[in-house]
Amino acid sequence: MFIGIKSCEKYNDNYAVEVEYIDLFSTRIYPDGKGGQLGDRGHINNIKILEVKEDKVIIADELKKGEYEYSLDTERRNDIAVQHTAEHLFSGIALKDYNLNNVGFRMGEEVSTIDLDSDTISDEMVKELSGKVNEAIRCV
């Protein structure tokens, strides 16, 4: 896949690039924080993508204006998609079976958390809810 670099500016200890997609079929680089999800990582011209914002991509080294090959970490992207889907499944079962609303979700690199609107969730309830979610996943 190829991407156009429209500009490159120093950004803290790294560089911020404004990108332009060359064709309609190029995979878009997904930004951090959109919909509560983690953003894409990968490489542009073998330079590591460190962070993705709505209007710029933060990379580890400087690039001149032009067209470059890029790749995304598909394993990371798939993991993010699975976590996002699991959050919806967990939230749906929590609401349906326990009348608990999801009031917050934070997806992390190592750990993700869901906040439910109750101060009295027991360890047994968490175990039971997790079991129902895992059973629903196995049925799919």
Q: Where are the language model's segments positioned?
A:
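A glycine- and charged-residue-rich anion-binding loop/surface
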Residues: 1-140
